[in-house]
Amino acid sequence: MKKSFIHQQEEISFVKNTFTQYLIAKLDVVEVQGPILSRVGDGMQDNLSGTENPVSVNVLKIPNATFEVVHSLAKWKRHTLARFGFNEGEGLVVNMKALRPDEDSLDQTHSVYVDQWDWEKVIPDGKRNLAYLKETVETIYKVIRLTELAVEARYDIEAVLPKKITFIHTEELVAEYPDLTPKERENAITKEFGAVFLIGIGGVLPDGKPHDGRAPDYDDWTTETENGYHGLNGDILVWNDQLGSAFELSSMGIRVDEEALKRQVEMTGDQDRLAFDWHKSLLNGLFPLTIGGGIGQSRMVMFLLRKKHIGEVQTSVWPQEVRDSYDNIL
């Protein structure tokens, strides 16, 4: 049992270390330290889809403030790029750990404990557009494939990803599969192509509903791009044979500028957020234009090692019935 446990841990470390090295080199970012707590009221917390309640923390020696365990570092990263004067084309990545206790379900792919490569870059002049988003997606996908090939060479786990990732807009997807749910659409398109970047998540589609929820103040999901489509964000999805479904590895996007922020908070009824320090800084032009996202570490390891449950590659909390159903839960 000990031998198996140690081997399991070595595999996990190999995937994480290999991916980190490739990501830093190919995306041209520096690894930095990030926070676990966010001060309530400064607007730095990531509100995700807007329904999740963060873990609240009181610090004994700072009695006049309340803190929350971060959901992600989407806003902190942009603030940090501005604070330390990162130039165009430069960026950072954080080995982020977070808690999301309001997950709808604790299942094969969802855990209370979240670990991500949380990255952000300053956009070069004139490149706040769909072409640059796609270029960045292709870079990250190359990192995923290089890591998969390294895993194949070391552990004899056959590489399955296609050489190229396929791009499709959510508007195209709902037109192609009008009778399917968003998740069913993802399954259909990802099974066909193997790896997909789904563009434009957060805005209302022609069927009257968004593909999925997104907070209004980090990704730009409203800017018109091409052919009447909208959104400068999206998800990297791969086909997971172990689960028989599409599998999200990353959510990312070009971040809101002043106009997109004002437009999106009005659409979601979150204008009160504009009173936060972070949002004021953005509206006053103090932040650079950026692109960023999160790449799930445990999800990446789970996929590349062909595991059936995320609990096989991370230590978290699970209902007893989950532990009873899977022998290799950590």
Curated annotation (Swiss-Prot):
Its EC number is 6.3.1.1. InterPro entries: aa-tRNA-synth_II (IPR006195), aa-tRNA-synth_II/BPL/LPL (IPR045864), AsnA (IPR004618). Signal peptide: none annotated. GO terms for cellular component: cytosol. Keywords: Amino-acid biosynthesis, Asparagine biosynthesis, ATP-binding, Cytoplasm, Ligase, Nucleotide-binding. It is found in: Cytoplasm. Its main location: cytoplasm. One of its GO terms (biological process) is L-asparagine biosynthetic process. It comes from the Bacteria. GO terms for molecular function: aspartate-ammonia ligase activity; ATP binding; catalytic activity, acting on a protein; transferase activity. Coiled coil: none annotated. It catalyses: L-aspartate + NH4(+) + ATP = L-asparagine + AMP + diphosphate + H(+). SUPFAM superfamilies: Class II aaRS and biotin synthetases (SSF55681). Pfam families: AsnA (PF03590). Pathway: Amino-acid biosynthesis; L-asparagine biosynthesis; L-asparagine from L-aspartate (ammonia route): step 1/1. CDD domains: AsnA. Belongs to the class-II aminoacyl-tRNA synthetase family. AsnA subfamily. HAMAP family: AsnA (MF_00555). This is Aspartate--ammonia ligase.
